[in-house]
């Protein structure tokens, strides 16, 4: 079969042949980098429309697990940051909760989008994503509270 389903089957076959633990190597499969830099003559290069599948083929189950642990850590800390900014808003200490909620929702949308496209393959997307993730962590954990100034 062709299309996305056919490319997924070819990708999984390649993973079976090359080794599930470590994959085929970064930049060797499934994206613009692999298509533009075809370094192995006997390998067929093609694009796969799923960032998680691309990551698994390139880095194996080990790399996918490491990425998913990073994502889960971000999601947990993002929820904590939302809770803290919501509590600060209730106490009248901060007005950052709506901004943080919007950032978190947008970043979660990117994670969903990665299931259908290699969105992280674009350098600017990766830079925006992790910059906003850092801003969310700053707002929830690292920002200093305002101190009252007495004259």
Label every model-predicted segment.
Residues 27-31, 64-67, 113, 138:
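Short, electropositive, low-hydrophobicity segments enriched in small/polar residues
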Residues 101-151:
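Transmembrane alpha-helices of multi-pass inner-membrane enzymes
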Residues 7-10, 51, 55, 61, ...:
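Generic recognition of well-ordered alpha-helical segments
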Residues 17, 35-39, 71, 117, ...:
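Short, well-ordered loop/turn and helix-capping segments at boundaries between secondary-structure elements
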Residues 21-25, 64-66, 121:
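Extended hydrophobic-aromatic, low-complexity segments
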Residues 2, 14, 20, 74-81, ...:
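Hydrophobic membrane-targeting alpha-helices
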Residues 1-13, 17-59, 81-85:
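Long extracytoplasmic/lumenal interhelical loops at the membrane interface
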Residues 58-109:
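Hydrophobic transmembrane alpha-helices and their immediate junctions
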